[in-house]
Amino acid sequence: MLPTFRFAAILAVTLFASLAFGEHTSNWAVLVGTSRFWFNYRHMANVLAMYRTVKRLGIPDSQIILMLPDDMACNPRNTFPGTVYSNSNRAMDLYGDNIEVDYRGYEVTVENFIRLLTDRVGDEMPRSKRLLTDERSNILVYMTGHGGNEFLKFQDAEEIGAWDLADAFQQMWEKKRFVDRF
């Protein structure tokens, strides 16, 4: 298993173990792959592995926001078209037929991510692209990509800083959009 996948699995199990003892009405996951291009295949595999994990632990697609650059499965360099695997033995196709991508390609931006978290999206935005949480919701936010000390790159075009993320979480707290976040 990939070290990142192990970490993701441990994080997801910890999340749901903690939820078993608390009052809650809804569990949500926001899963973000921030890297494009073939040489970042591993980042798409990471976020899809986390997607499968949270689904297996009981979060329905209606409560998972999946943000993917979505260009690896159909990339001409992919020797197994339409598939994404996390290891060389190809034991499990992570892409499969049952994934629901909410934000894809150039929709995966810092602005859209912050708007999603803080509920600053227009009324025309479909429910599938909204984080419909409240003060009793638990939220897992998982992001994978390239970054450095206090920042993460989005598609090699822009960056989100630690302070931007902290500010978004503070706004979410003030708007009573979660009870706990992971």
Question: Model-derived features: where do they sit?
Answer:
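Active-site microenvironments of hydrolase-like enzyme catalytic domains
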Residues: 135-153
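Structural motif
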Residues: 28, 138-140, 181
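Boundary/activation segment at the start of structured domains
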Residues: 2-136
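Cysteine protease catalytic core and zymogen-processing segment of caspase-like enzymes
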Residues: 124, 148-182
